[in-house]
Amino acid sequence: MIVLRRILVATDFSPAARFALARTGQLARQHDASLHVVHARPDLNLFCRASSAGGEHYQGIFEHAEQALKEELAYLERTFAIQVRGETRMGRASEALVAAITEIQPHLAVIGARGEHNAPAPPFLGGTALKLIAQTDCPVLLVRKPGLAAYTSALAAVDHSRDMARRLVDWATALLSEGDCHVVHAFDTPYVQRLRARGVSEAQIQACAEEARKTARNCVDDVLSGTFTAGRRLHAHLVCGEPIGAVLAEIARYQPDLAVIGQHRGAPLENATRFVGTVSLRIAYHAQCDVLVVP
């Protein structure tokens, strides 16, 4: 069972951050969770190296950030009637946010998928969001869509790891207030072309594919049988194909409010780059909906 009592949301006062704030406020109200809003501003030395502006401009940025943060806290309290705390931290955004997560220990971290810089084309994934996912063990919700209403449809992309699959489905159903949760298991028969080149018969290849489907079905059935579903409808989908394309096709087909994907952990030395180039990254980058990345 997912316990969601503390939520942290990052803000840079951009439109994308406003989407993230609204979603976080809705989730905090739904789960009766406390909410911590964090804004990162550059220290003076970093600001002066990156800009020709002087200290007086830096002071203006600081004052604007403090006022903007107060306004965002007031918006959250007024709109969602929740308990909210806010703070400004100095330093690079990703580093400040990771430090805040380490100290506050939220059950969920939320960030706008784009950040303050305009993306060249949708859907895109901002650098701070990417670094945050790579450098923390906290589930991270990437918000792309505006809206104050609760999620009513979700898609959990699972694989052969039953423990991870259960975790993803638990998160998907926890963030839904009610509605449909699509559980997608993409499977494939490895090395089909090599098998054909070696003269393996189509009947044998088909038998391998059926065995892969059976394994996927057993995994999904096992996960769904142990899922608490009050007010949610679970739908299992077995899709034969390469995981990235298969999952993105299912997202396009069912148009969920939220996609939930797993991030398998590597060795500690890989932390800074372990998310780069992975299946999870590519799905998170291309999915045109909110995406929750679960470690």
Task: Give a label for each model feature.
Residues M1-G55, S153-Q204, H286:
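Small/aliphatic-rich secondary-structure junction motif
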Residues M1-V3, R23, E56-G60, A74-A109, ...:
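Structural beta-alpha unit
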Residues H36-V38, R85-R89, L141, H182-V184, ...:
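General small-molecule cofactor/ligand-binding pocket signal
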Residues C48, A121-P122, R167, Q193-A197, ...:
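Short, well-ordered secondary-structure micro-motifs
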Residues I111-K131, Y151, L258-Y285:
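Glycine-rich, Arg-bearing micro-motifs that act as flexible, cationic patches
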Residues G127-P146:
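Short, structured interface segments
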Residues V140, S280-P295:
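Short, flexible loop segments at boundaries between secondary-structure elements
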